[in-house]
Amino acid sequence: VNAQLQQLKSLVLDARGAVLDNAFAETEGSEYGAHHLTIDGLSVHFRVARTTPKKVGQFVTFWKRATGDQIEPFDVRDDFDRLIVVTWTPKSYGYFEFPKHALSEHGVLTVGTTEGKRGFRVYPEWDEPNNRSGVAAQTWQLNYFSDLSDQI
């Protein structure tokens, strides 16, 4: 279990009495701390977002290996319930807990013939997006965001 997942466990999951089971590192996405686990019986994918030098927000990948060398976005039919994305800076720390339906509604997951995304930007409340798509993304994403900056 990586350090960010361990910190989330101690700050959030333990505090709410949640049971974390079956955590294992995913072979794909290790540079984003990719893990799969269950929390209170829900199937959860976990990622750590990364700061990029030239754009506001943080980037996270969320894809699966298809066949051979091909990768593809997760599909609404895939068996999972949540995606948790930790985001942090030297002064701030928080996480997004996206339910599957929100990822589907906002084009992250493949639905039918509409292909989802292999990665996307997250915009915690301390970021100020400087374009319309960033503002729109932050607007829906903040519904699933918890700021823990005062606890670190």
Q: Locations of the language-model features?
A:
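Acidic-basic catalytic patches of nuclease active cores, encompassing PD-(D/E)XK
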Residues: 1-23
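Short, surface-exposed beta-edge/turn micro-motifs
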Residues: 32-34, 79-83, 92-93, 117-119
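Short, flexible beta-strand-to-coil junctions
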Residues: 40, 85-92, 125-127
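Short beta-strand segments
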Residues: 44, 94-96
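Helix-rich interaction surfaces within compact, conserved domain-sized segments
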Residues: 104-151
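Short, well-structured hydrophobic secondary-structure segments
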Residues: 20-78
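Short, charge-rich binding segments
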Residues: 72-79, 85-89, 111-113
